[in-house]
Swiss-Prot record:
GO terms for cellular component: ribonucleoprotein complex; ribosome. GO terms for molecular function: rRNA binding; structural constituent of ribosome. InterPro entries: Nucleotide-bd_a/b_plait_sf (IPR012677), Ribosomal_uL23-like (IPR013025), Ribosomal_uL23/eL15/eS24_sf (IPR012678). Keywords: Ribonucleoprotein, Ribosomal protein, RNA-binding, rRNA-binding. It comes from Staphylococcus haemolyticus (strain JCSC1435). This is Large ribosomal subunit protein uL23. Pfam families: Ribosomal_L23. The keyword Isomerase does not apply. The lineage of its organism: Bacteria, Bacillati, Bacillota, Bacilli, Bacillales. It comes from the Bacteria. Part of the 50S ribosomal subunit. Contacts protein L29, and trigger factor when it is bound to the ribosome. One of its GO terms (biological process) is translation. Signal peptide: none annotated.
Amino acid sequence: MEARDVLKRPVITEKSSEAMAEDKYTFDVDTRANKTQVKIAVEEIFDVKVANVNIINYKPKKKRMGRYQGYTNKRRKAIVTLKEGSIDLFN
């Protein structure tokens, strides 16, 4: 899997913005990507050193629209911790 295929988008929320002060950055990643692939992708794309990767899986939620029901997409979120002395990604 290519590095650009692993990372989908950065997650910008109040909680993730506060974590950026501690060099922790949050990304939506491909559901098939593992921690090693996420680490390699972040290091390759942003030219930084990664210390740790934590991954959270979100199950699809039930949704209804009138009489039709379905599910939202499942997603996978990665929290990437950078090593000391790395450059800020979004600042």
